[in-house]
Amino acid sequence: MSAPLLTLNNGVELPAVGLGVFQSSAQETADAVETALCIGYRHIDTAAAYGNEREVGQGIRRSGVPREDVFLETKIWASDYGHDETLHAFDKAIAKLDTDTIDLLILPQPMPAYFSRTVAAYQALAELYEAGRVRAIGVSNFTEELLDRLAEWTDTVPAVNQVELHPYFSQ
């Protein structure tokens, strides 16, 4: 299986098809990641809030696929928004995933009522990007208005705005 690649605004290539592990149990996650990589998947999507980052790392290692061939995406949960909190959450994520870098790091939701925390979290992502610790950064479920508000506070344009879209939830 070879998924088409999408080129992000910074030139990083993102496999268009990936495995998401939301609500997967620990053992199921490790097995699913290993199997997905063995059959050709190269994009794994997880998040701290899913509670299975450690098992994603295990599945990657067990697959035998070199880490540099896997596009690894994770998300900082809203409870970890804020500059220092986000940097700490990133350190926890890479320890659990057993990797030095993340390919795509996302803020999974805006917090309009506490937007200064969202901005501080995004600024921390931008620092991680500039330091080469993540290859691309982005947001999720931001409206056009919230993207404009974010742009007022940063020069780093999100590489993605991941939105939920399926037959039961259209936007």
Q: Which sequence ranges carry the predicted segments?
A:
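A structural motif
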Residues: 41, 99-102, 134, 158
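Conserved, mostly hydrophobic/aromatic
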Residues: 19, 36, 44, 56, ...
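Active-site mouth loops of central-metabolism enzymes
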Residues: 14-28, 74-84, 112-116
